[in-house]
């Protein structure tokens, strides 16, 4: 029976490349000269450290630009609120959103079922598996979900006939 998976994944190597590019730009920019500004990355989340709000905002802008240029959807990152880090420093955590959580999965399933397409969506861990007897129905389902406005980037893979 034909099927495909709806997933939300991020290429961690591309994120790593974007973080390294952002670090280089932060080190080279004139408005960061002589100030303490640091971008930390531990494969799960990033931490922006700087002396004031302006520098945190500039670092966030640089990071978003570099991620976008490397093909990472900006919906895949979540900026936490800025907090005090001690020693007159400010900290902002940036987390990567991977996988489809239950609430968003329910919204996607509701969208698919309301469309009256002859497909069967089901939740499997942090992804959705959609099956049907017709490949055409699956392709209509893909275009329907692409048109939906969801708060995270969605990819469609493992299309099997």
From Swiss-Prot:
The UniProt GO MF terms for this protein read: nucleotide binding
Q: Give an example GO cellular component term for this record.
A: cytosol
Keyword Cell inner membrane attached: no
- Tell me which InterPro entries the record gives: DUF520, UPF0234-like_C, UPF0234_N, YajQ-like_sf
Judging by the UniProt lineage, the source's domain of life is Bacteria
Keywords, sorted A to Z:
Nucleotide-binding
Any Pfam family from its record, for instance, is: DUF520
What does this protein do, in the record's words? Nucleotide-binding protein.
Name the family.
Belongs to the YajQ family.
Cited HAMAP family: YajQ
**Protein name, entry field:** Nucleotide-binding protein Bd0338
Task: Give the source species.
Answer: Bdellovibrio bacteriovorus (strain ATCC 15356 / DSM 50701 / NCIMB 9529 / HD100)
- Lineage of the organism: Bacteria, Pseudomonadati, Bdellovibrionota, Bdellovibrionia, Bdellovibrionales
